[in-house]
């Protein structure tokens, strides 16, 4: 255990925060404005202990006031043993590269703020319809996470700086607290606790909260509920040590690159150093970091040039654990931005002046010349246009309005907690650019689909045979198309209909021949049959007769040379054959029906 702490060198730490928020808690934790008004002012001093241990008192409450959001307190913590135990338990790399520039008071503020960031109010349990008195508030305990909402506190070295980060606290409440501090008589009081007991209490606090899920996320949420912004020492992050944490405008972020110096510059506001993850005012940064010179934003071109000249002389110390073998150079972001801002103004070069700058040779086959003059504003970028004195001046630098708008948007996003790197999702889905060139089968009727699949759209005469689709090669239109089932069904219906029609004509012809024969009663020579008028005959019969006459000659010649055959058909068939072989009378004309029947009978051979 460390030696006995020096009580004279132990400075006081001031702690401030809300003890509760109205209408935020439920059950016995809820505190109403009527209860607070009845309990104020307290009749006795209210102690400040650790984790509700009454034998581990490290400070005292200076004042409690009623704010519109809830009871707000300001207290003092001065315990040399607490500083000694925390200093001995902290790792040597806990403060990173700021270990040599931080004072003992600042180290104590970092350790206490991050180890005990919240408070828990212990009050008297009230019975139903009981009105509280001045003994309602029992004590205030420093802890990791309190049960009530918005109970994260802020530690600092002065009363004014401890209540300053509470932006929602009214100015009247702040003035009343500061007036009560002047009347407080215990500013030089010291509270002593055994180091062994204090070490056990601190260890018990860590053990009892180690299973709390996402405790730093809960602390960050409670801090935002309390309205704390611009705080200095609270690091609500899961990273180990202060070198892995950044804190910009009260918004935490988890960054894996520990130990890299990276500062964010805000005009007239604090500077947040990524190497330490804390925010300090411009004056404090100049005092604590001698190798960094804090400058305000440039207001004109002469200021930009002066800032660029000063930034070129900056030689920051590399942090511990970072290789410095010439692989890279560590430059704070704020001064790198100022350096780029000072170099955006293009120099006025007279025509014909010699160019002694560096020339860069482009790759083989590049459309640009092998060498073009350097441009500090657009180095590493392709040439923008050809209208400058050299021909390739690069992209024009942004004007002052664009810079101001960019700074305004960044500040607005940081205030509202908006991540500008997150891609936007509030946009419509991308439309298919190839959709107009695709085939639209839904708008086609069945005939179009059949003609398209079969490739025989010329049969109906309404659609072209070679359908062309935009964007499709010519040879694709002539490829074999897939034939739909409806096409074959239609072809089958057409062929069956033709056969049925022919069979009907033949049946009608046979019926007509039978009727003519029945009128005469007996078989007569063909010359005695009367001719049937042309108007009463089916025109399709004449067409079929002409087609059969061309075939009858061949069939008759074959019958004359062939041997006679024995026909076992009935008497009607023999009669028809006899009539067909009867000689024609000279000068008579044969009837078309008889000729057709004769040819049909001859065709049977």
Curated annotation (Swiss-Prot):
Keywords in alphabetical order: Host cytoplasm, Host nucleus, Hydrolase, Phosphoprotein, Protease, Serine protease, Viral capsid assembly, Viral release from host cell
According to the record, the residues making up region (Interaction with pAP) are 326-344
Active-site residues from the entry: 52 (charge relay system), 120 (charge relay system), 139 (charge relay system)
Q: What is this protein called?
A: Capsid scaffolding protein
On whether Hydrolase is a keyword of this UniProt record, the answer is: yes
Residue(s) at site: Cleavage: 236-237, 578-579
Entry comment, domain topic: Region of interaction between pPR and pAP is called Amino conserved domain (ACD). The region of interaction with major capsid protein is called carboxyl conserved domain (CCD).
Q: Name one GO cellular component term.
A: host cell cytoplasm
- Entries under HAMAP family matching the protein: HSV_SCAF (MF_04008)
The segments labelled Interaction with major capsid protein in the record are 585-605
GO BP terms = nuclear capsid assembly; proteolysis; viral release from host cell
Report the enzyme's class at the first EC level: hydrolase
Species for this entry: Varicella-zoster virus (strain Dumas)
GO MF, any single term: serine-type endopeptidase activity
- Enzyme Commission number(s): 3.4.21.97
Q: Which family does it belong to?
A: Belongs to the herpesviridae capsid scaffolding protein family.
């Amino acid at each position: 255990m460390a030696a006995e702490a020096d009580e004279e060198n132990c400075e006081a730490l001031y702690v401030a925060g809300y003890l509760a928020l109205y209408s935020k808690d439920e059950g016995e934790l809820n505190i109403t404005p009527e209860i607070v008004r009845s309990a104020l002012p307290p009749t006795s001093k209210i102690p400040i202990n650790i984790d509700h241990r009454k034998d581990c008192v490290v400070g005292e409450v200076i004042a409690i006031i009623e704010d519109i959001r809830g009871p707000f307190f300001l207290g003092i913590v001065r315990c040399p043993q607490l500083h000694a135990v925390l200093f001995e338990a902290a790792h040597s790399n806990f403060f990173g590269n700021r270990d040599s520039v931080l004072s003992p008071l600042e180290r104590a503020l970092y350790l206490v703020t991050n180890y005990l960031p919240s408070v828990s109010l212990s009050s008297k349990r009230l019975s139903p319809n009981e009105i509280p008195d001045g003994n309602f508030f029992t004590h205030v305990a420093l802890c990791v996470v309190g049960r009530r909402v918005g109970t994260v506190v802020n530690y600092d070295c002065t009363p004014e700086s401890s209540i300053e980060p509470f932006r929602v606290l009214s100015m009247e409440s702040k003035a009343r607290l500061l007036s009560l501090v002047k009347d407080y008589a215990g500013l030089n009081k010291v509270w002593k606790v055994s180091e062994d007991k204090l070490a056990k209490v601190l260890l018990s606090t860590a053990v009892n909260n180690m299973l709390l899920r996402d405790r730093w996320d809960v602390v960050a949420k409670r801090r935002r509920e309390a309205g704390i912004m611009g705080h200095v020492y609270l690091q609500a992050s899961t990273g180990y040590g202060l070198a892995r944490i950044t804190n910009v405008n009260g918004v935490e972020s988890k960054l894996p690159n520990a130990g890299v110096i990276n500062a964010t510059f805000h005009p007239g506001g604090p500077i947040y150093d990524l190497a330490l993850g804390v925010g300090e005012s411009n004056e404090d940064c100049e005092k604590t970091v001698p190798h960094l010179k804090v400058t305000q934003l440039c207001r004109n071109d002469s200021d930009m040039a002066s800032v660029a000249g000063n930034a070129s002389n900056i030689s920051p110390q590399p942090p511990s654990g970072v290789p410095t073998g010439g692989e890279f150079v560590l430059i704070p972001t704020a001064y790198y931005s100022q350096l780029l801002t000072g170099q955006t103004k293009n120099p006025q070069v007279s025509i014909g002046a010699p160019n002694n700058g560096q020339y860069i040779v482009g790759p083989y086959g590049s459309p640009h010349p092998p060498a073009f003059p350097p441009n500090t504003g657009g180095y590493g970028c392709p040439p923008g246009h050809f209208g400058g004195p050299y021909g390739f001046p690069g992209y024009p630098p942004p004007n002052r309005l664009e810079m101001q708008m960019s700074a305004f948007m960044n500040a607005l996003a940081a205030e509202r907690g908006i991540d500008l790197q997150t891609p936007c999702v509030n946009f419509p889905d991308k439309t298919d650019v190839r959709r107009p060139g695709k085939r639209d089968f839904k708008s086609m009727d069945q005939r179009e689909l059949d003609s398209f699949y079969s490739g025989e759209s010329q049969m109906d005469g309404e659609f072209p045979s070679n359908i062309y689709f935009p964007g499709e090669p010519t040879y694709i239109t002539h490829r074999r198309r897939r034939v739909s089932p409806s096409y074959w069904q239609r072809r089958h219906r057409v062929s069956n209909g033709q056969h049925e029609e022919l069979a009907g004509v033949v049946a009608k012809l046979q019926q007509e021949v039978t009727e003519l024969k029945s009128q005469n009663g007996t078989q007569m020579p063909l010359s005695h049959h009367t001719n049937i008028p042309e108007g009463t005959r089916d025109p399709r019969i004449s067409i079929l007769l002409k087609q059969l006459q061309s075939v009858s000659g061949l069939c008759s010649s074959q019958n004359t040379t062939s041997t006679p055959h024995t026909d076992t058909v009935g008497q009607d068939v023999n009669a028809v054959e006899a009539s067909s072989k009867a000689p024609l009378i000279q000068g008579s004309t044969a009837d078309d029906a008889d000729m057709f029947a004769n040819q049909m009978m001859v065709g049977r051979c």
